């Protein structure tokens, strides 16, 4: 009976470990922030001058992106091209 309990506990732990949601670690954060899935969900915006499309980011521009339009109360219109 004791060994059956150990097997049941191991199976339960494996089940929980394999089925739980993914934990985003700090070193993953940039990957998650810039993932194709996240970018596809973002709203497009027009940069100053209207010649370029940007992407609206609520918490500011990610690394290697540039703020291409000012005047938003909250968030920024950012582009990877502008300012280079």
Curated annotation (Swiss-Prot):
Keywords: Disulfide bond, Neurotoxin, Signal, Toxin. GO terms for molecular function: toxin activity. Expressed in ectodermal gland cells. In adult female tissues, highly transcribed in mesenteries (gametes-producing tissue) and slightly transcribed in tentacles, pharynx and physa. Disulfide bonds join 45-77, 47-68, 61-78. Residues 1-21 form the signal peptide. Negative results: does not show activity on all ion channel tested at 10 uM (hNav1.1/SCN1A, rNav1.2/SCN2A, rNav1.3/SCN3A, rNav1.4/SCN4A, hNav1.5/SCN5A, mNav1.6/SCN8A, rNav1.8/SCN10A, BgNav1, Shaker IR, rKv1.1/KCNA1, rKv1.2/KCNA2, hKv1.3/KCNA3, rKv1.4/KCNA4, rKv1.5/KCNA5, rKv1.6/KCNA6, rKv2.1/KCNB1, hKv3.1/KCNC1, rKv4.3/KCND3, hKv7.2/KCNQ2, hKv7.3/KCNQ3, hKv10.1/KCNH1/EAG1, hKv11.1/KCNH2/ERG1). Has toxic effects on zebrafish larvae. It causes contractile paralysis and twitching of the tail within 20 minutes, followed by death within 30 minutes. Does not show any toxicity when injected into arthropods (cherry shrimps or grass shrimps). This is N.vectensis toxin 5. It comes from Nematostella vectensis (Starlet sea anemone).
């Amino acid at each position: 009976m004791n060994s059956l309990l150990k097997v049941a506990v191991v199976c339960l732990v494996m089940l929980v470990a394999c089925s739980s949601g993914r934990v985003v670690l700090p070193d993953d954060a940039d990957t998650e922030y810039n993932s194709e899935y996240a970018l596809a969900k973002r709203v497009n915006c027009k940069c100053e001058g209207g010649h370029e499309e940007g992407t609206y980011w609520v918490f500011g521009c990610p690394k290697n992106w540039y703020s291409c339009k000012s005047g938003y109360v909250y968030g920024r219109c950012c582009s990877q091209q502008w300012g280079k």
